[in-house]
């Protein structure tokens, strides 16, 4: 079905915390341009999976492969580099209140050591795609909850990552803003970005098929 190798893979992955098994025997792969949903109830281990994929947590057993590399044994510098290569839309994500919306969005591009001019131009394009171009000079506290989340999505996508990780990104939004956010994530997938979303709800982006990975009894224990 796919001519290219997976963008990332979980191979027989398990996680134990304080001698309690939280995940076990988790195996799946994701390919370029897929919109994937990691579906499960609160406490099922969705965030643990995202933490492993972004290098914030090591699996107790099994392998996590990203772009052909086994990341289990990455050192801290390699883990930071891995996270910088991804777009992260995580729970508890923050915008800096002493910076404008535009300045917040361009931060990843500046960290990637791009020229400020190029970073600024990319940030404006990202804001335009997310419908926030007119709000670029505002401070985060002047935005609605939905606008803040869209600004964080613009920041996640500003470096044109191959992979966007999203942890319950629409959990605090009303139905209209939630659908807007999901549709924008779908647009990233249409452009070839792999979107990996963890949620207890099943999103329905327009014009994009969602592949669902269920965190059920075969992959976790509570």
Language model segments and positions:
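Conserved ABC ATPase "signature" region
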Residues: 70, 106, 117-135
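Catalytic Walker B motif of ABC-type/P-loop ATPase nucleotide-binding domains
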Residues: 164-167
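Conserved catalytic motifs of ABC-family nucleotide-binding domains
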Residues: 160
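Conserved ABC transporter NBD signature motif
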Residues: 62-71
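ABC ATPase NBD coupling module
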Residues: 71-87
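Conserved ABC ATPase signature
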Residues: 139-143, 147
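ABC ATPase C-loop
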Residues: 156-157
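Helix-to-loop junction immediately C-terminal to a conserved catalytic motif
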Residues: 54
